[in-house]
Amino acid sequence: MAKFVFVTGGVVSSIGKGIVAASLGRLLKSKGYSVSILKLDPYLNVDPGTMSPFQHGEVFVTEDGAETDLDLGHYERFTDTAMSRLNSVTTGSIYQAVINKERRGDYDGRTVQVIPHITREIRERIKRVANNSGADVVISEIGGTVGDIESLPFLEAIREFKGDVKRNDVVYVHVTLLPYIGTSGEIKTKPTQHSVKELRSIGIQPDILVCRSDRPINDELKNKIGGFCGVNSEAVIASLDADSIYSVPLALKDEGLCKEVLDCLDLNDHESDLKDWERLVHKLRNPGPSVKVALVGKYVQLNDAYLSVVEALRHACISHDASLDLHWINAENIESEGAEKLLQGMDAIVVPGGFGNRGVNGKIAAIRWAREQRVPFLGLCLGMQCAVIEWARNIAGLEDASSAELNPNSKHPVIHLLPEQQDVVDLGGTMRLGVYPCRLQANTTGQSLYNEEVVYERHRHRYEFNNSYRTLLMESGYVISGTSPDGRLVELIELKNHPFFIACQYHPEFLSRPGKPHPLFGGLIQAAQIRVPSSPSEAFNPQSKIIEKKSLEQQ
């Protein structure tokens, strides 16, 4: 029988509930418990797949093809456990399910209401994760802030949940903020007291308080908070601002968060094994020489839009004893100012995914710069499509080459709509989504990096390489190093006689893990460390023993 942890947040939004939930998952796993984490988002969208990256940040794709909140990426990276579509719940998906049941007559003519029907559906979703994952502990992060009207059905549902299970099968963790007032020189507890009061008014008494602060919290303050909030002082956990999100699990362990959770759940407090995580944090705090990486995108004003890409770069740098010096380059600025001005001095260039016309010419210019100046390059999804367009225009002689998405009237649509997408009308959840196999060609950089014949990668796209141009581009020097097993879909391309130039149709960033960097990102960083060689004979060699050839596990 699974145990359940509910993580709520108060005082302000973006308090760090996702990192707390992911960190707790890491700590529980280090003690031998299996964990699954789900996110309950209070917005009315069915999923974030159609939301602007400026509104929501990155859309994280699970192996079964769900478009989810970026927090699921944190859950997977911290616990090294694959989540599924069941781990992402929104108000929109709950209401959609309840309305569909009402239309089918499942409620036998009863009046359908928020209580009990919506709250029961929420509880069933949580239990479904427990049943399908078989996890010892299921952690649920409730999005939003206590006091928001949007979160009320979820808070009511988790209040009701304690009536479905034994008391020691559920624990409530509330994350709050302790602001410091400089003029008085004091840390203020009143916002936390009021947040807990609001939570109590709903019927939830938190068992544990995780208090965010930018300065240490002494025992006297913990006793005060515990006394006013009805929580044991040992269960008042200080969470100080950290130098890295990866140091948070160790800090929370030292504060006793995991012990308090295990005590509440009546679980044995086994010896923890965090040696690998401690080594990871040590390397983060003691990096080697910096590597300048340009991330050329169209959503760079919001860093969260490329969260998994940044984390994958960070994982690769940790593995190769490098310090990531990330430069955010707006693709539109390249169009107006030129690639040389903005990319001069970069050790590597990454062009990530995206949609639409804006900034595409800047991405193509950046790719041309990487190719001609022999700067290590990695293209992801749209980044691969732009790389194909750049080569077709400037090397293969197809001046009008483009994507059918960007220019429907192009004479040479080297990127076109997938056949199965021709009659698709709805935007949400209709792309090529989730894990698909990719067969790698022997004696290529891609195959050497993966050290596998077939790999499994996550996709999110509607457009694909147009096979009508495959022969022409290959004859002009393009290398197709990975395809679908039937050879129909081009998944991975690269160039010979270049230090490192590789691009993929999929999203490898979703499979990168701390301590287990994705091979493509690892190859990019190693090539960047070597810098730009002066001749092809000095080019990056993927057979080098320096590379950690860690194959992807089939999820």
From Swiss-Prot:
Residues the entry annotates as binding Mg(2+): D71, E141
Positions of ATP binding: S14, I15, G16, K17, G18, I19, D71
InterPro entries: Class_I_gatase-like, CTP_synthase, CTP_synthase_N, GATASE, GATase1_CTP_Synthase, P-loop_NTPase
Active site: C381 (nucleophile), H507, E509
Activity modulation notes: Allosterically activated by GTP, when glutamine is the substrate; GTP has no effect on the reaction when ammonia is the substrate. The allosteric effector GTP functions by stabilizing the protein conformation that binds the tetrahedral intermediate(s) formed during glutamine hydrolysis. Inhibited by the product CTP, via allosteric rather than competitive inhibition.
Keywords, ordered alphabetically: ATP-binding, Glutamine amidotransferase, Ligase, Magnesium, Metal-binding, Nucleotide-binding, Pyrimidine biosynthesis
Region spans: Amidoligase domain: 1-267
Enzyme kind, highest EC tier: ligase
SUPFAM superfamilies documented for this protein: Class I glutamine amidotransferase-like, P-loop containing nucleoside triphosphate hydrolases
Record's catalysed reaction(s): UTP + L-glutamine + ATP + H2O = CTP + L-glutamate + ADP + phosphate + 2 H(+); L-glutamine + H2O = L-glutamate + NH4(+); UTP + NH4(+) + ATP = CTP + ADP + phosphate + 2 H(+)
Residues reported to bind UTP: S13, K188, T189, K190, P191, T192, Q193, K224
Family of this protein: Belongs to the CTP synthase family.
Note, other: CTPSs have evolved a hybrid strategy for distinguishing between UTP and CTP. The overlapping regions of the product feedback inhibitory and substrate sites recognize a common feature in both compounds, the triphosphate moiety. To differentiate isosteric substrate and product pyrimidine rings, an additional pocket far from the expected kinase/ligase catalytic site, specifically recognizes the cytosine and ribose portions of the product inhibitor.
Protein name in the entry: CTP synthase
Organism: Prochlorococcus marinus (strain NATL1A)
